[in-house]
């Protein structure tokens, strides 16, 4: 049987995600971000709600990406997620992309010339942002051009790099309907951005979300809910360079900007430069919110939920892979658990995220 991996955020889960799961074959394993997202923002609803949405709509097993994999630039995000899925025995990786290319060929190219390609990136001027450097590399070695608004294509290339040299086949699926950042309501498939923006419009949600009741009942948060706490973390920290990935230049810019910024959005605008993209600045602010430090990634994989098919697969992995299904006295990953506690501060009605929580079981599928 084919074992298909999917790397996702489901922020929130919508019909486009359901379409992706429907297109995937065999046993479907999802490696999903926890409560903080790749582009440096809190999830609109918590990880358990999103895992349940996925399991109700075709996923067989949902595992959690640790905080320091979730909140990373595309390459590290892809690498960390593929590592986890590889250990769970996937033989193919399915993903949505705006531009369906021969990603397998691209992965083979990276297998062959990876070292040379990375050297090329290192030698590019520092005035370029990391995404610009990566795009220059793909243009040079694979003749790829970027149309600009294609974040899923950028992630797809990160997955191609991550599977290089592994026995995993890549299966791109053409993205349906609205673009990633689109807030357009008049489409067949709405984007997660649009659903977050129109979260109070029930008709809209019902048109584009398969598990709409779950979403409506869940406690929701946005970045602004954490602004007072973020402000406190910035003002009370004498040296922001002790925080993961924060350099001197960014520390100075953030300290200066917080004096006048009235919101997270304003702070991001003030700190962003040509070299430091908004997504990168949001990630840095997320690290500051968490007081994140460089840390080793957990050995074990945290299971959020499964169907009967997924449970059988986990049984077959016993003894080969370290799995955590209940976080108790023994921590799974201190950094992720701390992030979960801080996530709960954004809305007092968010349920406890770790202690006493057991994987969601979906009986029928």
UniProtKB/Swiss-Prot annotation:
Say yes or no: keyword Repeat present: no
Q: Supply the EC number(s).
A: 6.3.4.-
Q: Which residues bind ATP?
A: 7-20, 96, 152, 175
Q: Where in the cell is it found?
A: Cytoplasm
In terms of domain of life, where is this protein from?
Answer: Bacteria
> Which catalytic reaction applies to this protein?
cytidine(34) in elongator tRNA(Met) + acetate + ATP = N(4)-acetylcytidine(34) in elongator tRNA(Met) + AMP + diphosphate
Instruction: Extract the InterPro entries matched here.
Output: Rossmann-like_a/b/a_fold (IPR014729), tRNA(Met)_cyd_acetate_ligase (IPR008513)
Q: Which GO terms describe its cellular component?
A: cytoplasm
Q: Matching Gene3D superfamilies, A to Z? A: HUPs
A GO BP entry: tRNA modification
Q: Which residues form the signal peptide?
A: none
- Pfam families noted in UniProt: HIGH_NTase1
One Gene Ontology MF term: ligase activity, forming carbon-nitrogen bonds
Q: What does this protein do?
A: Catalyzes the formation of N(4)-acetylcytidine (ac(4)C) at the wobble position of elongator tRNA(Met), using acetate and ATP as substrates. First activates an acetate ion to form acetyladenylate (Ac-AMP) and then transfers the acetyl group to tRNA to form ac(4)C34.
Name the chain's protein: tRNA(Met) cytidine acetate ligase
The organism's lineage is:
Bacteria, Bacillati, Bacillota, Bacilli, Lactobacillales
Gene name, per UniProt, is tmcAL
